[in-house]
Amino acid sequence: MVGFCLAGCTAGSASAFAQSSVTLYGIGDVFLGSVKAPGAHTAIVQQGGGMTTSFWGLSGKEDLGDGYSSFFVLESYFQPNNGTFGRFSGDGFFSRNAYVGLASPFGSVRAGLLTTPLYIATISFNAFTNSYTFSPWIYHTYKGLGPQGVIGDSVWQNAVAYTSPTWGGLNGTAIYSFGNSSTVPGAHKWGVQLSYSNGPFAASANYQYINYVSTAGDIGTAVAALPGLQKESTTQLDASYDFHVVKVFAGYMNIRDKVTFGTASTNSEQVSFAIPFKTASILAELAYSNSSGSESNNAQRLTWAVGYDYLLSKRTDLYTAFKYDHFAGESTGLTYGVGMRTRF
């Protein structure tokens, strides 16, 4: 992480109202292994994002005095295996975060492209954190199969969010995403989160709502198994406890989809743990999802993963992991490999 002072805020400038700084930071992650999704063929790959999707970012803050400050964040994903930006073809340049904000003693407000509170809770309360290659909780939340999984991305465009101060370990966040067009009056998303942390215990409660874009049923194109999807609501409860010899995570999620001719409801649970050693951690995680309702096909999915993460230094680690992923009616998915991650 590299910090530097903006040219106009040197200590010798008598007219400077407040100190400002900009920080450059990021993570590079490369992975070599075998990847097979349920129902798909096996591919031997060298790619990015085994444990963390690679990204770089710039953040800045200006102290305005009396407990107030302004800030900004710009973050861009990249693929270290081929040098392209984004997570996939067509992804935006600053697709991780892009916002400005104001912090005060009464909380903070941000506006722009924002990471959702649901995503932050999902990666905070599972042993494999934000791994889009190995984390079962990520897969059951954001990489659903059939009628399962959350609609949309882990970031929302045209969004505004408020985060409260922390009182006794408790704080809250509310987020709203605008349709930004007079021709799509139905387009909006919103979510709320309550978080609590006290010593070794932490917990989070999330609710997220996504409405149709312009006419009822048009977001169904996002999920082929749910034609005519009109709206979706997601409730997620997570908790963790650090026993020092092992950190345990648990989560429950309900996703309820309203479609033109019926409903689909998916209940998901996960349990995972991380066993720390002096320079390493053993990771294990299990997630299960079961769908019901007239449009659900009673789909079921079971995913588990184990991994070993070894620290070379405070910034760099090596890892190896294996994931088993079974979705009803499809051949089992198996993914395994080794990787390296470094922070700057």
Where are the model-predicted features located?
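Cleavable N-terminal export/targeting peptides
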Residues: 1-21
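Outer membrane beta-barrel
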Residues: 19-33, 43-178, 186-188, 195-202
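Transmembrane beta-strands of outer-membrane beta-barrel pores
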Residues: 30-36, 76-80, 115-117, 176-180, ...
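Outer-membrane beta-barrel architecture
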Residues: 57-59, 99-101, 161-163, 193-195, ...
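Repeated loop/turn-to-beta-strand initiation elements of outer-membrane beta-barrel proteins
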Residues: 68-70, 106-109, 169-172, 200-205, ...
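Solvent-exposed loop/turn segments connecting transmembrane beta-strands
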Residues: 151-157, 178-187, 259-265, 293-300, ...
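Detector for outer-membrane/organellar transmembrane beta-barrel domains
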Residues: 191-305
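Outer-membrane beta-barrel "beta-signal"
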Residues: 332-344
